[in-house]
Amino acid sequence: INYGKNRRTGVDFSLGYNDKVGDFEYGIQAFGQTNSSKNLKVAENVENDYMRTEGRLIDALWGYECLGYYNSQEEIDNDKVKSSFGTVKPGDLRYKDQNGDNVIDSKDRVVIGRWSAKFTGGMNLTLKYKNFTLFAMLTGQFGGNAIKNDTYNWVYGERKYSDVVLGAWTENKYKNGESITYPRLTTQSGDNNFNTSDYWMYSTDRIDLSRVQLTYDFSKSLFGDNALVKGLQVYVNGSSLLTIAGERKQMERNVGSAPQTRSFTIGAKVEF
């Protein structure tokens, strides 16, 4: 028997304004949409209310709540909470025991974020003066999250090392008060550290200068009535020119598929 009920809501909008002052024309358009989803009824049997998906986002991001690092063997020995992911060593991640059973396992996963953006949108700007036209497009998204769980960030076993390991935990770094941005390195599977948790979560908020184009239209008067060419337009444009984001490198790198690329085009449109 299939049992379930969910709701998806959102708002789309588009606003524009155009005006002309002498030889100068301009236009601006803003557009966007909001996105929300919720599980209204779910057939589930869970031990604790925090584990319920009913009443939560459909695209909720579930994971462990990280409390930092274990910085010594003494901390590990004195901690009543044990990991079900194998032997824990200094430099490993420490998680919150949500249900108080002194074991870190799948029952300790909670909602730590959401996969999809709450809002996506953008803006178009067109400026025209005599024969020149400048067009620019900004796009953006806000309110979503993702996990750094690709091979660039999850380095263990025989995987190739990336520059993220430069911030790996070591005893000397800890004692010297140096910045630590990565768990200890291991030649094993690292099951404890490489789980979906808020330690690896990042915001996918971004603003992109998606496209800019400059166009010049040659005057029709340059072409006679009997000319083969009736009109000529030349242009230069660029795509994916700029990304503003806290995790710009992570998103542009796009590990596992083609990285984000920038392109430039010079062209002409001929009317016969």
Annotate each language-model stretch with its function:
Residues 2-7, 18-115:
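Conserved small-residue
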Residues 17-19, 32-38, 129-131, 140-144, ...:
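Transmembrane beta-strands of outer-membrane beta-barrel pores
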Residues 23-24, 131-135, 221-222:
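Repeated loop/turn-to-beta-strand initiation elements of outer-membrane beta-barrel proteins
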